[in-house]
Structures are given as structure tokens and as C-alpha cells.
Amino acid sequence: MINILVSNDDGVRAPGIIALTHALSEFAQVLTVAPDRNCSGASNSLTLTNPLRINNLENGYISVNGTPTDCVHLAIRQLCQTEPDIVVSGINAGANMGDDTLYSGTVAAAMEGRFLGLPAIAVSLVGKSLIHYDTAAIFAAKIVKGLLEHPISRDQILNVNVPDLPLAQIKGIKVTRLGARHKAEGMIKTQDPAGKDIYWLGPVGSEQDAGEGTDFGAVAAGYVSITPLTVDLTAYNQLDGLADWIIKI
């Protein structure tokens, strides 16, 4: 039986992680370690100025007073009795497509698995109602089983986005590239009860690059999107042009 580490950024009691853990437990030994609160948008942040504390919950999960990245790092380095065969992060309540991936704690948790030498996938449910976590969990389980026979390179992760639809309405799977959003909308300014100004982040930008071949396009058409991601952010097509002038400064 394989060993799977499960984490997320929505918190240890979120419906997505419960559905994911249940589906994977049908064929694997699963350890679920996740933040004790919602950490959406935490990206790859680590807790460096405070100690991490764990809490063993009644359902066997472990909560941590840290970020998604903290959870995966702590689990692999300290809590897992046997090194996991794979890290699975999710199921996120909402899309992680295009630019979202740079902010996502869900994707970051999977990336931390990759940084520690393990294959990893991030799974998100895309839609307005967010009720079909069972659909996303089924696909997550299928993908994990597939990776046992077709391992991915350890310098990448798979980013999976599943439409919020009943299983029978999913049209299939498409391997995609990341799309892109327009820039985010403005800040929302209001006041607290004491009359002091406070600010909220505005909505994310609307879809900009969402055509054929993108994650946005696949999900909108009713397909599960799977995008292989790597941590190398180098803009290779800019290297020569930049070197032509900047080394002369």
C-alpha cells in the first residue's frame, strides 16, 4: 500500500480535504496535515518567527498553526513515520488557474513536496456553488493511481482543476497550459466601527488568455484541466536581449 500526504490551504476541516482524504484512503495509507485555519493566498510562505504547534484531531487529521508550506515541510521532515510516495494538495474551494498559481497555498503545498523530492499534485474545484467535491476527489484518485505507473519528473507538479459538475457531466481530461487574467480590480476602502480606514483586496482580474489549450478554456468547456508546472521562472527568451545591453552598464 502506498503512502500519501494530504494537505491544503482552506484549513483542516474544509470539505475539500475531507473528500480527498476519504477517496485516497480507499487504496492508500493517508496522513492528512493541514492548517488550523483558512490560509488561502498564502503562496509559499513559511513561518520563521514563531514555533509550529500541532493538534491531533478526533478524525486522525493533524492541524498545524502554520501555512500550507509549513504543514508539508513539517509532515515530511517530522510527522510521517514513512516517507510519502506522493503529496496531494486540495481539494481547493475555487480555481487555481493562470496567475492564481503564484498566489495559491494549494499549489504551494504541492510545490513544497516537490522541493523535498516527492511527486506532487494540486487539485481545485472550479465553479460558483462548489458542491461536487466528490467529482474532484474521484479524478484525484485516478490521477494518483496513474502516476504510480507513469511517474512525473520530480522537478514538476501537476496542477488539476475540476469543473464543479456531477461526474457524468465531465467531458474528459485535457492537458493544458496556464492561461492568464487581467490585472486585479482595485482595493475596497471602508471603515471599522471606530471610524478608522480599513482596506480589503478587490476581486481577482477577469480572464484574459482563456482560449484553446488553456486551463481556463478547458474547464469552461467541461473538461478537467491538468497543467504540468515547474518552479523555473526564468524568461529564457529574454536572456540574450537583456545581456546585449545590461552587461555594458
UniProtKB/Swiss-Prot annotation:
InterPro entries, per database record: SurE, SurE-like_Pase/nucleotidase, SurE-like_sf
Single Gene Ontology MF annotation: 5'-nucleotidase activity
UniProtKB keywords: Cytoplasm, Hydrolase, Metal-binding, Nucleotide-binding
UniProt-listed Enzyme Commission number(s): 3.1.3.5
Swiss-Prot/TrEMBL cofactor(s): a divalent metal cation
Keyword S-adenosyl-L-methionine: no
Assigned protein family: Belongs to the SurE nucleotidase family.
Matching HAMAP family: SurE
Protein name as catalogued: 5'-nucleotidase SurE
Organism expressing this protein natively: Shewanella frigidimarina (strain NCIMB 400)
